[in-house]
Curated annotation (Swiss-Prot):
GO MF term list: small ribosomal subunit rRNA binding; structural constituent of ribosome
Record keywords, A-Z: Ribonucleoprotein, Ribosomal protein, RNA-binding, rRNA-binding
Summary of the function given for this chain in its UniProt record: Binds together with bS18 to 16S ribosomal RNA.
Protein name as annotated: Small ribosomal subunit protein bS6
Amino acid sequence: MRKYEIMYIIRPNLDDEARQAVVDRFNNILKENGAEITNVTDWGKRRLAYEIKKYRDGHYMILNVVSEPKAVQEFDRLARISDDIIRHIVVKEEK
């Protein structure tokens, strides 16, 4: 099992219920693939450093995860094709 930090930005024009549904959906993707989410940090809505997909703001979420690479790869694959996530990054934490 490896430790990962996942940061993703949700598009700002979603209401609270829709945003929570996106967060729950992607948390469940990780859990269904055997990942353990150790920490969830909601940074809230922040201004982006530059425009991404015509958005100037985004809702930031940061997850700390312990999992096999398979779970993170599935998260990455689905985050790439989701219209609700405008940017994401997965970083493997050093030992």
